[in-house]
From Swiss-Prot:
Name recorded for this polypeptide: Trigger factor
Enzyme Commission identifier(s): 5.2.1.8
Pfam families: FKBP_C, Trigger_C, Trigger_N
Gene Ontology CC: cytoplasm
Keyword Thylakoid belongs to the record: no
Residue ranges of every copy of the PPIase FKBP-type domain listed in the record: 174-261
Coiled coil: none
Listed Basic and acidic residues bias regions: 456-466
Length: 473
């Protein structure tokens, strides 16, 4: 007797999805049903029968044919799916989706007949670049601002400041206020989630808290109470509060100020372990210039990556975006865990949902860029040789030998490969593209001119109906 084989038909769908129609012969279905019954029989306990010796009909009557079929059907789908993707050399990006649903399939399941299953899954998209050479981008030409050195020194002074109590004067910007407050929504009188504290140290700086909160405390004296009528910004992080009016009852419990150290050689020794203030300034300038140059380089790379992404011709499947979103959330959770936070209590379903929504646009951008770089690698045959990977891996030898954790060498090699390939691709982009630096003044001038032109057109559009009315009269 010739054993019947699984029949697979595939159809390409939009958004890099593929449909698979499977025809599973009745012999396979009967075999799985029989195997399921035997498996349950070996472990089922029914009074009056020895373990493993329960008659088939008794078992079916006791457990129910529907439950037996459901168990067998799950195994049939799983095995047939794995066999089908191997036969067709398909690399799925997502779990298979049963088009007709499991319940519908179970309702019509008959092991005496050929079983037809319709499945869909996401697959890697076909990549093509409309253009790779001769890309042109514009970036704003910026100069290093020497004022940033003074700002860095001032920041360091603030960090090393002594905190002293304020006596006989009202609060002012720059102070540290110890406040208690309670907030409610003006319309519903409902308490604001996270909008209260019995004691909180608040640096009185603009843009801290919601608009008007810090400004409302400025001028208060210790033991003063004040009612603040404020409004949450329309783009506030907490969705429930956006655009709502609120009432805060605030009490100033204590007031402190910072006593800043003098800028001298002693400060240089304390702040940066340098012998003199002059030496400290030089060191800060060097670091800031390096950071500035790196930032400018990254701006250029970002612009080139965006330009290349726009040239990508591909239907990106939803599964790819979902995977990127999930990876981002997992990385965030790992960072929180390293800080000692309880992940289980912190990462509630609501927070995970919020993070998924907020990180999705960036995830889409990341996937688009990565696919564009992959397409460039394929079209220009840009690769990384084994000797390059091995050379780079030597840099990690010392770190690997000292590490107390088990390091996955193969995974590290993959990371090194991806990093080296990305470096090569970006270098190729820089060499084969045009980057034009435009003055910040030109950008502002162009923006003003566009705004004026838009305002003029809007004004003309508004006056046009009035002109027509006069003509009719």
């Amino acid at each position: 007797m010739i054993k019947e084989a699984l029949i697979v038909k595939t159809t390409a769908l939009p958004q890099s999805r593929i449909a698979l129609e499977l025809e599973i012969p009745s012999n396979t279905c009967k075999s799985f049903v029989s195997e399921t019954i035997n498996s349950i029989s070996r472990s089922a306990k029914i009074p009056g029968f020895r373990l493993g010796k329960i008659p088939k009909q008794v078992l079916i009557q006791r457990i129910g044919i529907n439950q037996l079929y459901a168990s067998a059907l799950e195994k049939i789908i799983d095995k047939s799916w794995k066999e089908a993707i191997e036969m067709e050399s398909i690399e799925p990006l997502s779990e298979p989706e049963l088009v007709d649903g499991f319940e519908s399939l179970l309702k019509n399941f008959n092991p005496e007949k050929t079983l037809k299953i319709n499945l869909q899954t996401d697959v890697a998209p076909t990549l093509k670049l409309k253009k790779s050479k001769g890309l042109s981008v514009e970036i704003i030409k910026r100069k290093f601002d020497p004022k940033s050195i003074d700002e860095a020194l001032e920041k360091s002074r603030n960090q090393l400041a002594n905190i002293i109590p304020v006596i006989n004067r009202p609060a002012r910007l720059g102070d540290i206020a110890v406040v208690s407050f309670k907030g409610i929504y003006k319309d519903s009188k409902k308490a604001i989630d996270g909008g209260s504290s019995d004691s909180m140290d608040l640096e009185l700086e603009k843009n801290k808290m919601i608009p008007g909160f810090v400004e409302g405390i400025v001028g208060m004296k210790i033991d003063d109470n004040k009612t603040l009528n404020l409004k949450f910004p329309d783009d506030y992080s907490h969705e429930e509060s956006r655009g709502k009016e609120a009432i805060f009852e605030v009490s100033l419990k204590d007031l402190k100020e910072k006593e800043l150290p003098e800028l001298n050689d002693d400060f240089a020794k304390q702040s940066g372990n340098k012998d003199s203030l002059k030496e400290l300034k030089k060191d800060i300038e060097k670091q800031l210039k390096e950071n500035f140059d790196n930032t400018q380089k990254n701006i250029k790379i970002e612009a080139l990556m965006d330009a290349l992404s726009k040239e990508l011709d591909a239907e990106i499947p939803k599964a790819m975006i979902d995977i990127e979103v999930r990876n981002n959330i997992e990385q965030t959770a790992q960072r929180f865990a390293q800080q000692g936070m309880d992940i289980k209590s912190t990462f509630t379903p609501e927070l995970v949902k919020t993070l998924a929504e907020s990180t999705r646009p960036q995830a889409e951008k990341n996937v688009q860029r990565n696919l564009a770089l992959k397409a460039l690698s394929e079209s220009e045959n840009i690769t990384v040789e084994d000797k390059e990977i091995n050379q780079k891996m030597k840099e990690y030898d010392d770190e690997i030998s000292k590490s107390q954790k088990q390091i996955d060498i193969q995974k590290l090699k993959e990371v090194v490969l991806n990093d080296l390939l990305k470096e090569k691709l970006i270098t190729w982009l820089e060499e084969n593209s045009t980057v034009k630096e435009i003055s910040e003044k030109v950008t502002k001038s162009t923006t003003k001119s566009k705004t004026k032109s838009k305002t003029k057109k809007e004004s003309q559009a508004k006056s046009e109906p009035n002109k027509k009315k006069k003509e009719k009269k």
